[in-house]
């Protein structure tokens, strides 16, 4: 029996990348998986991800949704509850970057990143918590970043959104703990994804030189951490931030 057998996980921004890795990991441990992305089609990978999850013998469905839209989020969560029966695990993974130095950053760049990265998490937590309260149990995982812990020049919007996700997880942990709901955050470091693969080899080597393990992490590293926080292995863990960064930040 898998660690998540009989549970339903809802993961945002999971058509590819870290979100997809988490979805597949959860499914391999027996969870039924509902996931969202801006598009669920062949072009953007959503339908392929849905098929890969289902091939592991669990129920899987992708929902096209703008996670930053409060009304759309409420509608998605209602559909997941109706079609899956419960929401036991919520992973707030949806995120974007629109980098720029402070004096060159536009209001649109700031607002877009805060909306997708931070407001979306509020939207989904707000919609899922009533379901979890009725179940007297639930695990909420916010995908933050080491940038949210230490900041990063040229990423003030992204850093602020990720720091907000950490504070949001801690606040929800305090507020919802008496209801049996746990909330934690994962702060990945330099992870090998399509986003980081687009960087030059020189930049990638410079990053690796700053990491004690001398390499970037993998999406599997993050998925394994998410599995721990989603499962009963972490039943007494709440309000925490786990940095998965190869020792980059100590």
Predicted feature residues:
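Alpha-helical segment proximal to the catalytic Tyr-Lys
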Residues: 130, 174-178, 235
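Substrate-binding pocket helix/loop in short-chain dehydrogenase/reductase
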Residues: 101-102, 109-114, 196, 207
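Residue(s) in the substrate-gating loop at a strand-loop-helix junction
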Residues: 145
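Active-site helix of classical SDR
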Residues: 125, 161, 169
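C-terminal helical subdomain
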Residues: 185, 208-233, 237, 246
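Active-site loop immediately N-terminal to the catalytic Tyr-X3-Lys motif
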Residues: 103, 150-156, 178-179, 214, ...
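Short-chain dehydrogenase/reductase
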Residues: 2-84, 98, 108-109
């Amino acid at each position: 029996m898998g660690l998540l057998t009989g549970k339903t996980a809802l993961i945002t921004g999971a058509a590819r990348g870290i979100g997809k890795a988490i979805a597949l990991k959860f499914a391999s441990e027996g969870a039924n998986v509902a996931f969202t992305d801006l598009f669920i089609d062949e072009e953007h990978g959503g339908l392929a991800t849905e098929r890969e999850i289902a091939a592991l013998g669990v129920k899987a469905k992708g929902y096209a949704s703008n996670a930053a839209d409060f009304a759309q989020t409420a509608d998605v969560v209602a559909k997941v509850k109706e079609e899956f029966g419960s929401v036991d695990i919520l992973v707030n993974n949806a995120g974007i970057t629109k980098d720029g130095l402070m004096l060159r950053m536009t209001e649109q760049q700031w607002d877009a990143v805060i909306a997708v990265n931070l407001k979306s998490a509020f939207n989904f937590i707000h919609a899922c918590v009533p379901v979890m309260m009725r179940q007297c149990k639930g695990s909420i995982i916010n995908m933050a970043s080491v940038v949210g812990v230490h900041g990063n020049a040229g990423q003030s919007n992204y850093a602020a959104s990720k720091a907000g996700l950490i504070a949001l997880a801690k606040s929800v942990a305090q507020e919802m703990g008496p209801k049996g709901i746990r909330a934690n955050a994962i702060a990945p470091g330099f992870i090998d994804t399509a986003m980081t693969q687009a960087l030059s080899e020189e930049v990638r080597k410079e990053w690796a030189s700053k990491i004690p393990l001398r390499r970037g992490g993998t999406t599997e590293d993050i998925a394994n951490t998410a599995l721990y926080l989603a499962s009963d292995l972490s039943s007494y863990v709440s309000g925490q931030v786990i940095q998965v960064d190869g020792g980059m930040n100590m």
